[in-house]
Each structure stands twice: as C-alpha cells, then as structure tokens.
Swiss-Prot record:
It comes from Bos taurus. It is found in: Endoplasmic reticulum membrane. The gene is WDR83OS. The keyword Methyltransferase does not apply. The lineage of its organism: Eukaryota, Metazoa, Chordata, Craniata, Vertebrata. Keywords: Acetylation, Chaperone, Endoplasmic reticulum, Membrane, Transmembrane, Transmembrane helix. Component of the PAT complex, composed of WDR83OS/Asterix and CCDC47. The PAT complex is part of the multi-pass translocon (MPT) complex, composed of three subcomplexes, the GEL complex (composed of RAB5IF/OPTI and TMCO1), the BOS complex (composed of NCLN/Nicalin, NOMO1 and TMEM147) and the PAT complex (composed of WDR83OS/Asterix and CCDC47). The MPT complex associates with the SEC61 complex. It is a multi-pass membrane protein. GO terms for molecular function: protein folding chaperone. Pfam families: ASTER. The chain crosses the membrane at residues 33-51, 53-70, 75-95. This is PAT complex subunit Asterix.
Length: 106
C-alpha cells in the first residue's frame, strides 16, 4: 500500500473544493420555467373554474406538477402550493358541477 502512495501524483495540499458561482453573477443559471408554469397553471385553473372547462383544469394540474418539479429547493413553496391547490380545486369543482366524462375539445 505504501508503494501506491509513493507513486500517487496527487498533492492533498493543492486540492480545492468546487464552489458553484452565485446566481446573481450569472443570470443564465436562473431558469424561468417554474415561474412560467406556475403562471400558466393559475391561468388555466381560473379558466377551468370560471368557464367550466375540464381540459383547462387538467392542464392546470399538469402545469403545477411541472412547476413543482423544476423549482429549486431553496425557493419559497407557498406560491407553488397555492397554484397546485387551485388547480386541484378546479378539477374537483368542474367534476362536481358536471360528473360526466370529459369530452375532447376538438
């Protein structure tokens, strides 16, 4: 084992730990996808609630899932959870008002 340590070219005192650059220095790392999907989810859920369109309510649930999946863990989740609950309530209310299966929009 000591023969391996002698032939090892690495120097432990020269090892530097990687530190990612702060996001305010590089705005390209800030992905706007969760924010856009959150906004789309709220718009579609309001359309699903007000216009009683079931497909809008389901698209709102889909957008909320995408927003939650693409968000960073350090972000505040209150807005995402309110968007998710709004989309779920749009689906529930649209099926409570008209329990028949969804008809295709085309």
């Amino acid at each position: 084992m000591s023969a391996n340590n002698m032939s090892d070219p690495r120097r432990p005192n020269k090892v530097l730990r990687y530190k990612p650059p702060p996001s305010e220095c590089n705005p390209a790392l800030d992905d706007p996808t969760p924010d856009y999907m959150n906004l789309l989810g709220m718009i579609f859920s309001m359309c699903g609630l007000m216009l009683k369109l079931k497909w809008c309510a389901w698209v709102a649930v889909y957008c909320s899932f995408i927003s939650f999946a693409n968000s960073r863990s350090s972000e505040d989740t209150k807005q995402m959870m309110s968007s998710f609950m709004l989309s779920i309530s749009a689906v529930v209310m649209s099926y409570l008002q008209n329990p028949q299966p969804m008809t295709p929009p085309w």
